Amino acid sequence: MSVEINKLNKSYGGPAVIDDLTTRFRSEAISVLLGPSGCGKTTTLRCIAGLEHPNSGQILIQGMPVFCDRQRINLPPEKRDLGMVFQSYAIWPHMTVFENVALPLKARGLPPAEVTRRVDETLALVGLGAMRDRGATQLSGGQQQRVAIARCVASRPRLMLLDEPLSNLDAKLRAEMRKELKDLQRLTNATMVFVTHDQEEAMSLADTIFLFRDGRIVQEGAPADIYRKPVNHYVAGFLGKANIFPGVIDITGKAMEVRTADGQFVLARGAALPGESARSASCLVRPEYWCAHGDGGRGLPGTIESLMFLGDRTEFIVTTPIGPQTVTLPGYRAEKPGDSLRLSTELTQMHLFAPGT
């Protein structure tokens, strides 16, 4: 079930929180709204849910308008056939797991036998079948989150909206819940719109990421596409760690040279891009795309300033003529601060965009 937004605007008397937003969230996919606090992502979600009243624009769910200022349409939340999972879980502490999940079904007037069937089926789906009669206060944080998700799923909504539902969990539990949410989406073919400020969460969950800034979408696309080919400095810096440096790029044959005020260096080798010649650009190299070599030979000279061993990888800060570079290499490394090395990469691993963007 798709969601379409056309020229949506929302403000609270000051600067626009949502600024002329137009986009579409695909049916039977996970769309993640990503961005810092105050960028408009949660307000967008609440407008879709009917919990906020936009100033103007249009929202369609499966082609049917649920909000349109010109036609004076503004369906209440209960008429939009959607479910929502909040950051706070909103679990009733005096009820059992079964009673919490059954509450919205009873409110809709479903027969008791149907309520029982749906609740038991949904609890089995989220792995809580053995806890149906346990009190809500006896559950862990992850179990409470699964109850909130089960309560949403039990109503068989056409659309699931999730507002930072994993932010209160520890790192290990967040990773487990991300997998469970992806599995749940595949099993139910639900359309999910998920809000987060956590870039790792967005990358692992999303079919499509919508990166927000100041009430607008700066870039949208598959996680790998946005990570590898950001449109500007903001996107590059927000989604992962980024080494960005200016230079004049000269591609001749199969080598890329970067000329800077501090010298000229061969950084990358590979097939030259069609039509490329010398031009000014901002260069992006992700930390894991740098290759490190012993001192001597060609490449960008550098000195290790500091390093951190992170278990599966070692992260270095390397001082170079084009500024400090973050370098990530797999596993444990024997290098130490003060060691000299050379850095290079492949043309396919370097992304260029216009200066000042």
Question: What is each model feature region?
Answer:
Residues 57-69:
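Conserved ABC transporter NBD signature motif
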Residues 49:
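Helix-to-loop junction immediately C-terminal to a conserved catalytic motif
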Residues 228, 255-308, 332-357:
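Glycine/charge-rich catalytic "coupling/switch" loops of P-loop NTPases
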Residues 21-32:
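Pre-Walker A (P-loop) beta-loop-beta motif of ABC nucleotide-binding domains
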